[in-house]
């Protein structure tokens, strides 16, 4: 949890992390997103309830890549709550070809491009291309006012470009179980 001016709070909560599933909640006072939905919808709902949030409070799901430990609950959350999903073109295509996720309304997919900022509410999000054995994996750098952190999962290798993208952070969450 970050603290600063009352309106600049930025929070991060790990709901699940590990080879059996990954899901992180990131939020400000007014807007919240999930990074990955790699556990059941029920476990996501329970995890959010533990931090006094509801699935309906989420403004979207940022998908890092298409492996099941990152998308297992994606279809359920999309169908149940109509949550928009943000992912690269390669990841979206791979998700659409993953039968266990089930049918997802194509309107819920929003294509993102590495190194191109996009905004969800008061959160500015920058996808960062990373090395991993997936279609088109990314990490996420998230900023609200003067607070910035990044969430990096399943990083295969790193190079100078990734190191540069991660400069100037207040916090780095590096998931290192891969």
Question: What role is predicted for each listed range?
Answer:
Residues 41-87:
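Active-site metal-binding motif and surrounding structural segment of the metallo-beta-lactamase
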Residues 123-178:
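Active-site-proximal loop/helix segment associated with metal-binding centers of metalloenzymes
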Residues 35-38, 58-66, 85-89, 150-153, ...:
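Active-site neighborhood of phospho(di)ester-bond hydrolases with catalytic His/Asp-centered motifs
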Residues 48-52, 118-121, 162-165:
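Short amphipathic alpha-helix with an adjacent loop that forms part of the alpha/beta core around
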Residues 89-139, 143-146:
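Metallo-beta-lactamase
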Residues 2-51, 138-154:
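Conserved beta-strand hairpin/beta-sheet module of binuclear metal-dependent hydrolase folds
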Residues 58, 106, 169-170:
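Short, well-ordered alpha-helix to beta-strand connector turns
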């Amino acid at each position: 949890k970050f603290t600063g001016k009352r309106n600049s709070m930025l929070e991060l909560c790990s709901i699940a992390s590990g080879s059996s599933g990954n899901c992180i909640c990131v939020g400000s006072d007014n807007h919240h997103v999930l990074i990955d939905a790699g556990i059941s919808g029920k476990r996501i709902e329970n995890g959010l309830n533990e931090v006094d949030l509801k699935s309906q409070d989420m403004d979207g799901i940022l998908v890092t890549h298409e492996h099941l430990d990152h998308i297992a609950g994606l279809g359920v959350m999309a169908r149940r709550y109509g949550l928009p999903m943000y992912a690269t073109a390669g990841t979206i295509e791979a998700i659409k070809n993953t039968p266990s996720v089930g049918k997802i309304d194509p309107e819920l997919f929003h294509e993102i491009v590495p190194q191109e900022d996009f905004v969800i509410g008061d959160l500015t999000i920058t996808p960062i291309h990373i090395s991993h054995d997936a279609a088109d994996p990314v990490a996420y750098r998230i900023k609200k006012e003067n607070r910035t952190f990044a969430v990096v999962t399943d990083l295969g290798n790193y190079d100078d470009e990734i190191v540069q993208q991660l400069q100037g952070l207040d916090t780095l969450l590096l998931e290192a179980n891969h």
